[in-house]
């Protein structure tokens, strides 16, 4: 058992220990930055210095460090996070790795994201559920393209808190001049980020544990807090709980003739028994009769809670519909302006049909035009006809049906979507709705004769690929 946990259990008892941890606030954050900036090592150091590592884990790290470590005689703490064989052999992060730890003040969920450009989609996935970004910069290299890319994506995804950790200060002799040079370089770039962003910049050495969990004499010139102190005290606003009520229906629950409920997770806001609601896109209204959970009925439910709602009236609601309060100000449209993060080698092409998934709703859409692509180096824009792999651009989308939507910065769950290739069923992009546009009459989903014939051949000779029947998609 972890010695710190054992000591707490001895002092508080099991019930006291569980009660203490249950009432702590939760912070989700990600580590990002360029390749080899020390993201995994930093997380390993946080786990180690907060005594969150079990003795057998530490012994395994010491053993593995002799075989695949990159830190010489010292234990390679990055191995606590990089679990895939390919990651350990190459000394890089590929997949998003999640780790959990807690201190006396707070509980934490960390997403360790890859730094390589080809894994940008993994980084965007990790950032989409976080409240804060820890952006690492190698003190020897300064601000790089991936530093800017990850900062821009984090800002695009609505993160308002950035901690910029200038790592590997031990390799520049803890130079104050070098730290201030990098600080000024990053702040100049960050001036072009959208919205109000709280940025704190601090020097650290993840390998040596300098200024990670506690201040250090090596950085006596730095008067700011340690990384852990910032994480413990940063004030994260509870925007999801404070927003308007949104409930995307994931499943219509009808176990018998006497019960019909609508299951899903409250995306934002709060709902109570007796509240007047309306279902979108139909606009039909009713009242909440019950809020059902496995543990019994509730009087109210807030953001993040998975519940089943039953209504006083039998109105038509299906998977993908959105339940909101009757007086909610939300518009339905089939025409949106959205920022797109493109994640596949085949470029995003205007006019090509894609499956679009927004919360529980699945529809078909196509890009009418790519207005521009962002240049991550200076956040300027330039005109393009297509969006390439890892490109980020602003696009006009038309959908084949009217959908109730929010802007992404108002509600991530009902303002964000994923783009799915209709042939391979692979997620090829992520979209963040910037604005709703006037609805248009647009027919999407038409395929050429060659595409239909090729699809038929694939389904006949490669049935294990589970390719969709395009002729059926045209009828839907």
Swiss-Prot record:
G2: annotated span: 91-95
Region (G3): 112-115
EC code: 2.7.7.4
Keyword entries, A-Z: ATP-binding, GTP-binding, Nucleotide-binding, Nucleotidyltransferase, Transferase
Gene Ontology BP annotations: hydrogen sulfide biosynthetic process; sulfate assimilation
Region entry G4, spans: 167-170
SUPFAM superfamilies: EF-Tu/eEF-1alpha/eIF2-gamma C-terminal domain (SSF50465), P-loop containing nucleoside triphosphate hydrolases (SSF52540), Translation proteins (SSF50447)
Superkingdom, natural source: Bacteria
Residue span of region G1: 33-40
Region (G5): 205-207
The protein's annotated pathway: Sulfur metabolism; hydrogen sulfide biosynthesis; sulfite from sulfate: step 1/3
Residues at which GTP binds: 33-40, 112-116, 167-170
Domain tr-type G per the UniProt entry, residue ranges: 24-239
UniProt entry tagged with the keyword Aminoacyl-tRNA synthetase: no
Catalytic reactions of this protein: sulfate + ATP + H(+) = adenosine 5'-phosphosulfate + diphosphate
Gene Ontology MF terms in the entry: ATP binding; GTP binding; GTPase activity; sulfate adenylyltransferase (ATP) activity
Enzymatic class: transferase
Subunit structure of this chain's protein: Heterodimer composed of CysD, the smaller subunit, and CysN.
HAMAP family found in the cross-reference section: Sulf_adenylyltr_sub1
Physiological role: With CysD forms the ATP sulfurylase (ATPS) that catalyzes the adenylation of sulfate producing adenosine 5'-phosphosulfate (APS) and diphosphate, the first enzymatic step in sulfur assimilation pathway. APS synthesis involves the formation of a high-energy phosphoric-sulfuric acid anhydride bond driven by GTP hydrolysis by CysN coupled to ATP hydrolysis by CysD.
Family recorded in the similarity comment: Belongs to the TRAFAC class translation factor GTPase superfamily. Classic translation factor GTPase family. CysN/NodQ subfamily.
Protein name listed in UniProt: Sulfate adenylyltransferase subunit 1
